[in-house]
Amino acid sequence: MLFKTANACTYMDYPDRSRVHVYFADDGCRKEVVSLAAELGIGYIPCEDNKYAKSGNLNNALRHTTSPLIATFDADMIPRSSFLVDTVPYFLLPRYIQDGATGAWRYRSEDELNEDLKVGLIQTPQSFYNLDLFQFNLYAEDKIPNEQDFFSREVNQMRNSSNACAYTGSNAVISRAGMEEIGGFPYHTITEDFETSCRLQMAGYITYATDKVEAHGLSTTDVRSMVRQRIRWARGVIQSIQNTGVIFSHKISFSARITYLCSFLYWWSFFNRIIFILAPIMFALFDFQVVNCTLWQLLIFWLPSYFFYSRSMKLLSSNVRSQKWSQIIDTTLAPSLIIPVFLETLGIRETKFKVTRKDKTTNRSGSLWNMLPHLLLVVLSVAAIIRFTWGKYGMALVYSSVIIYWLCYNLIALLYAIAFSGGRSMPRKSTRISVDEPAVLTALPVEDEWSKLTEGTGEAVAEGGVFPDCSSDETDDEGPVGVFAGRAINMSDGGVLVRIDDPFPEELRSFAVRLGDGRYCTCVSGRLVRLFQSKCGDDESWYAALRIEHRSLEERRIYDQLLYDRETGIAEELDSWNTTYDDIVRIVRMRIRALLSRYRVWRSRRRSRRDSDRCGDSRDAERTSHDSAHVEGDAAC
């Protein structure tokens, strides 16, 4: 993970590369990181006896560097090569002005300079190259965007209007002058990024969120890690608002204070969600009235708010988030967040910074523990519907329709939450990324060539000569035995899928695989895993799935850039044609298919174990008869 990020940093474009310095800020003082820094030719800044988690590590790095601008990246955030050239120019705006007549940029004159115009932070959107848990667990890969896109691509950019953009801790550029003025990264919070942006704005600096994705990271891969991450965000935002008093500060505009008030109230909205779920249950099951009103009074107060909320979501979310998905996400997270938010607001603080795990520590993404509250609420909702409709007919059912609709509306969201927490198996170790790159497969002549390619220091010697030159399509009669052109369709850290123009004999197993053209072009060793023909619609193309190995460090570095310096291809908008019915049918069908697959695997393993036991019994019988013969022979002697 760290290799990918550091490698991408060394490939970033900049007019004068000598002014770009890349460092590992390591508060673990690990030998592996020291070795990796030396391997990639970048700096290493250790932080011994760090008592302040990420803030202490970053402040230590600030003390050991001098550049006027600092870009920060989390270990899993891989920057695009265009990151610096797209972000650094914003810091030049105080010295430049655009001519209204010609549109050309020029230096500001002394009279035009404004000392109050100071850029402190440029934040790019957070994006991810793997599916987030809502996409993955709900089998909605191409139906919904990443859950965090709504904040990064919509909310944070709208906060620009009040200069209340939030620093999200990674893929951002910060002014050193601004950091020195506010005393560095704040220590007494578990979300130092959010509080840093608050303090920069209160110091008179402009913070701005851009709309172009400049880095891709790794989403959390299991429900418990994601919930812990959200608890840290909730507690940290409340801590930072209390630490800075930003809601009541006159150092920022009134609109910015309202924005931060909304940030605080957002985390309390999960209480609203729980009340919204429990209210009809309490009335239908226990005759407890949360609100004592008539139907018309309810419609007068509820209907306008529902209408304006729906309209604002449609106008402001650009099809990234809908009211339905906001309800599903809030319902999923609410039971886990209400207690931490309540405690933090009362001043019972969480002071320990907990790093969010991004590596796959399990082959399941779900969590039964997080599912339990939703299961309980589903049982109560079903019981409430049955009790409330039992024995009612005609107009009695009509008068009860509001409560019944309310219960069913909440029940659907709860079923989504259960499906989410139920998780899904994750058989792959690395993420596949959709690509469209030229590929040339050069077949190698001997079956055992794979072992020759992967041993030693890198130069693989085949029966007919050295590893073929991937820069040319020409072949030697004594070396490669065939060249097959195609297009790489998807790639991962350990494999590539190539659509080939013509099939080749399956006896060919080892290949030199040339990938890409232009800036990134590399050749890797490939071992055929599967050769198959597509049966999807009219597509009758042949595909070759290959496992790859890198023969050198440089080869791996270029391959990583070819893989990650691109758009991810993951859905960025909601599928407008996808309905709740479609979701339910898809989730149920895929769950049944997964259960059948697991049953077949279990049955196959059981059969193999039974056959193995039979073979073992047979061998034991033969050994026993053989030993008996020896005993009888010894007795006869």
Indicate where each model-derived feature is located.
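Short aromatic/hydrophobic "clamp" motif used to bind/position activated sugar donors
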Residues: 70
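Catalytic donor-sugar/metal-binding loop of nucleotide-sugar-dependent glycosyltransferases
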Residues: 199-215
